[in-house]
């Protein structure tokens, strides 16, 4: 077999393996405004107009991974700039986590018992309604979930910031809200989020009702910003002003 033929066979096998493996993530923007999607440690960042999608593949073993949306961004041709919510160090291609407030889709693939673990979290606050889950649902807690309440419009005054609703830990700090020194429970402020998004993490130890699992290798995943039926589907229902134009090139 020639070297060229060997390379071609290797490429075809790799392509078939990739296209048949789970772990493909689609990030779709259904909001009536531009969202600058972000994903770490796999993905980076992408500008999404309404109706646009972005796909990337996360390999088995990926963990502590996040997907979120950024709003009111301005980036130059080199991908440097700033976002009002979810900013990740002033770059389009995120390498680190975003600045609160930002609604999060979190996941870890192919962990113990060959399970994928995933969730929606508002521990870092809320900026955009979101749905997240498997494209091929399975038994138990392997089904899509969402957080679509009008949290920005109803946000307590102590947590309200431009473009979103901040989290109590960032705002006030301390064990009560941050749970950094041992067990902790819900607070009145975390209950504000939980009552509106019962499937989402509302404080760091909100595991029993907020962690979802799917069997590894059985499904891909989809994140949607402003899923159908959410309060942000139409501009008139979005409670915080969005810009009519931006300056970035992305």
From Swiss-Prot:
Disulfide links within the chain: 31-226, 73-83, 88-94, 142-214, 147-197, 155-165, 169-178, 179-184
Origin superkingdom: Eukaryota
Induction: By abscisic acid (ABA), salt, salicylic acid, wounding, and fungal infection.
Signal peptide: 1-21
Pfam families: Thaumatin
Record's keyword terms, sorted: Disulfide bond, Signal, Stress response
InterPro entries: Osmotin/thaumatin-like_sf (IPR037176), Thaumatin (IPR001938), Thaumatin_CS (IPR017949)
Family classification: Belongs to the thaumatin family.
Name this polypeptide is given: Osmotin-like protein OSML15
Organism, as annotated: Solanum commersonii
């Amino acid at each position: 077999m020639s070297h060229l033929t060997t390379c071609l066979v290797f490429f075809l096998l790799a392509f078939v393996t990739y296209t048949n493996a789970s772990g493909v993530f689609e990030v779709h923007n259904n909001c009536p405004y531009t969202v600058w999607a972000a994903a770490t440690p796999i993905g980076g960042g992408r500008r999404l107009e309404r109706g646009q999608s972005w796909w990337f593949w996360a390999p088995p073993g990926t963990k502590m991974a996040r997907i979120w949306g950024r709003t009111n961004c301005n980036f130059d041709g080199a991908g440097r700039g700033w976002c009002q919510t979810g900013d990740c160090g002033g770059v389009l291609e995120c390498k680190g986590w975003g600045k609160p407030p930002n609604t999060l889709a979190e996941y870890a693939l192919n962990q113990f018992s060959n399970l994928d673990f995933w969730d929606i979290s508002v521990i870092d606050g809320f900026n955009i309604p979101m749905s997240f889950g498997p494209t091929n649902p399975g038994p138990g807690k392997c089904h899509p979930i969402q957080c679509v309440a009008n949290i920005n419009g109803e946000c307590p005054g102590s947590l309200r910031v431009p473009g979103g609703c901040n989290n109590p830990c960032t705002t006030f700090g301390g064990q009560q809200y941050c749970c950094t020194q041992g067990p902790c429970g819900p607070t009145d402020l975390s209950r504000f989020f939980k009552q509106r998004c019962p499937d989402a993490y509302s404080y760091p130890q909100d595991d029993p009702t907020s962690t979802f699992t799917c069997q590894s290798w059985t499904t891909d995943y989809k994140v949607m910003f402003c899923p159908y039926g959410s309060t942000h589907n139409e501009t008139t229902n979005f409670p915080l002003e969005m810009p009519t134009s931006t300056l970035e090139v992305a």
